[in-house]
């Protein structure tokens, strides 16, 4: 189905990543043998994507590719039809040969909030946990990262990532693996680890924070972004049912409480660098994601609350160092 051989070759050359070869090939082999629903249809579409390298690639300011002389109108329409087969597009935006993929999330806005507060990524190996379709991985490469590895169990995200990677000319500095972080050994290998939009989906948030720490080298940096509430170091919300129509959510600490959690798990120099209310300009339905989105999840009578009556989504970004 997929060949991960290039990734195996790459990590075999890294002393700290090489031990991953003891478990990873079997895990990915098991994944390939499992049933995957729409995967066959998506793979047939994926095989039709061009792989020739575009003349102009911009992953510093956005994620876009184009040829100097443009693309024929018929070829552009064919490419757009292929991309639309991979609906819904949640993370982006992308501009592929003049085709603007207007995704549900303005993930570039999140990146603009994160970037000023982190250590330079130049030459770093980066792990992006819950990476979605890999949008931020391209932006990390745009900042000079040597290698970005994303993990996300969603098959559609994997296919979308591979489609974009093909349109990038098969860039082999970014890899997405269909795994969850609980499937990773304690690698202690990455210079920077990102976890954005994952923590509130975890039944045991402290275990997740420790799992992030176990992937970092000594003095490596973690960037943790998650939904939070207002309050002091003891404030935490545990929704009794759904939150903004999400059913698989568990813990919403205050940013101050999350800082305490990270320190409890052994991180140092923990900083709260941003807190932002998610707006309906940042998350909304589009032509490329036609399902319900944030506007439908907020109370029609009070947009400061979800339709269940909880505080509307607010996100915090924390940055910390692994001293071990």
UniProtKB/Swiss-Prot annotation:
Q: What does this protein do?
A: Catalyzes carboxymethyl transfer from carboxy-S-adenosyl-L-methionine (Cx-SAM) to 5-hydroxyuridine (ho5U) to form 5-carboxymethoxyuridine (cmo5U) at position 34 in tRNAs.
Q: What binding partners and quaternary form does the record give?
A: Homotetramer.
Q: What is its EC number?
A: 2.5.1.-
Q: Which Gene3D superfamilies match?
A: Vaccinia Virus protein VP39
**What's this protein's name?**
tRNA U34 carboxymethyltransferase
Annotated source species: Photobacterium profundum (strain SS9)
Annotated InterPro entries: CmoB, Mo5U34_MeTrfas-like, SAM-dependent_MTases_sf
Give the EC class as a word: transferase
Q: Which UniProt keywords apply?
A: Transferase, tRNA processing
Q: Name one GO biological process term.
A: tRNA wobble uridine modification
User: Which residue ranges does UniProt annotate as crossing the membrane?
Assistant: none
Report the GO molecular function annotations: methyltransferase activity; transferase activity, transferring alkyl or aryl (other than methyl) groups
Catalytic activity of the protein: carboxy-S-adenosyl-L-methionine + 5-hydroxyuridine(34) in tRNA = 5-carboxymethoxyuridine(34) in tRNA + S-adenosyl-L-homocysteine + H(+)
Which family is this protein grouped under? Belongs to the class I-like SAM-binding methyltransferase superfamily. CmoB family.
Please list the residues that bind carboxy-S-adenosyl-L-methionine: 91, 105, 110, 130, 152-154, 181-182, 196, 200, 315
PANTHER family reported in the protein's UniProt record = METHYLTRANSFERASE, TRNA U34 CARBOXYMETHYLTRANSFERASE
Any one Pfam family here would be Methyltransf_9
């Amino acid at each position: 189905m997929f060949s991960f051989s290039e990734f195996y070759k790459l990590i075999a050359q890294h002393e700290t990543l090489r031990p991953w070869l003891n478990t990873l090939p079997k895990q990915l082999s098991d994944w390939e043998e499992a049933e995957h629903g729409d995967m066959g249809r998506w793979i047939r579409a994926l095989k039709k994507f061009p792989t020739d390298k575009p003349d102009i690639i911009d992953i510093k300011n956005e994620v876009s590719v184009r040829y100097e002389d443009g693309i024929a109108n018929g070829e552009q329409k064919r490419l757009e039809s292929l991309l639309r087969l991979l609906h819904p597009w949640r993370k982006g935006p992308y501009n592929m040969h003049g085709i603007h993929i207007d995704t549900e999330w303005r993930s570039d806005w999140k990146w603009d909030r994160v970037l000023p507060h982190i250590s330079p990524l130049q030459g770093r190996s980066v792990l992006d946990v819950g990476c979605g379709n890999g949008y931020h991985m391209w932006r990390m490469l745009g900042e000079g990262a040597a290698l970005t590895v994303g993990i996300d169990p969603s098959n559609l995200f994997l296919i979308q990532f591979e489609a974009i990677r093909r349109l990038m000319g098969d860039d082999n500095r970014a890899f997405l693996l269909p795994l969850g972080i609980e499937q990773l050994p304690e690698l202690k290998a990455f210079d920077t680890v990102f976890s954005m939009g994952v923590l509130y989906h975890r039944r045991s948030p402290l275990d997740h924070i420790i799992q992030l720490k176990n992937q970092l080298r000594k003095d490596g940096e973690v960037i943790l972004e998650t939904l939070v509430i207002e309050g002091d170091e003891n404030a935490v919300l545990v929704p009794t049912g759904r939150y903004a129509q999400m059913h698989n959510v568990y813990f919403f600490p205050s940013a101050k409480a999350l800082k305490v959690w990270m320190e409890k798990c052994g991180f140092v120099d923990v900083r709260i660098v941003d807190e932002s209310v998610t707006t309906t300009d940042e998350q909304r339905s589009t032509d490329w994601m036609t399902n319900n989105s944030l506007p439908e999840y907020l109370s029609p009578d009070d947009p400061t609350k979800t339709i269940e009556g909880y505080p509307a989504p607010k996100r915090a970004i924390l940055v910390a160092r692994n001293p071990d």
